[in-house]
Amino acid sequence: MDSIYCTFDQKLTLSDIGTLCKLTNAVIPIPSHRHLIGNTNLGLYTVLSTTTDYIQIRDILKTMVLTILQKVEGNQLILIRPKIGHQYEIKNTGPFPLEKGDQLSLLPPFLKPSQQLLVLPNWELILPLLIPTDVATEINVRMLCISLLSIHRKYEEVQIIIDELRTLQYRDVTIKLPDVINDCKSTFSMKTACISFSMIATMAPDIVQTYIERLSLEDQSMLLIKCQELLAKKNFSQEPSSFKATEIKTELQKIKTVFTMINQINSLTQEKTFFIVADVSADNRLATCIFKE
């Protein structure tokens, strides 16, 4: 196994060692892969000490190297870097119970912990949240929606709907999402979303109506009929059946642009799956997982 050794700058107390032992099997991100690191390279404290913005922390987390805490030996931690396809015991550091087959992602620690994990002078151990990928995506969608709704309105106008968006229930657990800070980073995400939406809205209807009409000749499904009804209400820049052989390249370019814009939106909301749950302990504190990437 590819072991990484983390040495603490000061001598740990027995209480500190006991706390770390309880975190065995936790996923801990580090900035880069080195065999010897100090405790300041461990976890997300360095990131959170410079920014509290969810989007920015999420982007930095994506670039970090994942390790798994294997053992505590005195003043030293032994971590391993997981390998694709291998199976590991993983500590559930998220708010939700896990089930077999869950795909798991990592998100910034947006929930206020009931207690701090380990606090030393000028440093604190802060871990990401291990969350099912579909829920992680829903969280990102809601955060983006909150940003878009609040960018041109006073908070009082959207307070009720934002409170609803911030409250998320999953598997009988209810969590509260953080407030969104509309700074340069989140504004960039909103610009990306708006540009993508506008290009899809401009290009998609013209090309889609042609395909819907052709498909409806073969399949009279209710979904296709509804699509036709929706498209019939729109005004098109040209007749949908007027594409000529010489315009195939233009049509193809529109299709590719629409798919590119869809991918742009996905990049704002989709999360990478790191683990797939193969089994879960009775108390749901540990999960046997296969490392995906």
From Swiss-Prot:
InterPro entries: Herpes_capsid_2. GO terms for molecular function: structural molecule activity. Transmembrane segments: none annotated. One of its GO terms (cellular component) is viral capsid. It is found in: Virion; Host nucleus. It comes from the Viruses. Keywords: Capsid protein, Host nucleus, Virion. Its main location: virion. It holds the Pfam family Herpes_V23. Belongs to the herpesviridae TRX2 protein family. Structural component of the T=16 icosahedral capsid. The capsid is composed of pentamers and hexamers of major capsid protein/MCP, which are linked together by heterotrimers called triplexes. These triplexes are formed by a single molecule of triplex protein 1/TRX1 and two copies of triplex protein 2/TRX2. Additionally, TRX1 is required for efficient transport of TRX2 to the nucleus, which is the site of capsid assembly. Interacts with TRX1 and major capisd protein/MCP. This is Triplex capsid protein 2.
